[in-house]
Amino acid sequence: IKQNVWSYSWITVQSVKQPKISSVMLKAFIVGEMDGISEELPFDELDEYLPRFPLDLRVKYFSSTKGKLSFPEGFTPKQVKFMLHYAQKPSEIYETNFEWSYGV
């Protein structure tokens, strides 16, 4: 991978006692800094092949997503942020953050 381009993958898991096919709406962001200013960049603006957000995932047990991100010059990633909700419950938003890491 060339400089400022990163491979990524994530797995969305449905953890319920009796899984059924569900529609999950997902948004993902890279939180970081550019020129000393905090920025939150959506994955769909950094990966030209990723559909526009929110992603509508069909999940029974799990769903896998992968691609390549291209960061703007001078951007330093700090965290990855995910926000999702079931399509039938848009007001119940689940959010989680992970520290940025590479080489894992």
Sequence positions of predicted segments:
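Membrane-proximal structural modules of membrane-associated proteins and complexes
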Residues: I1-V104
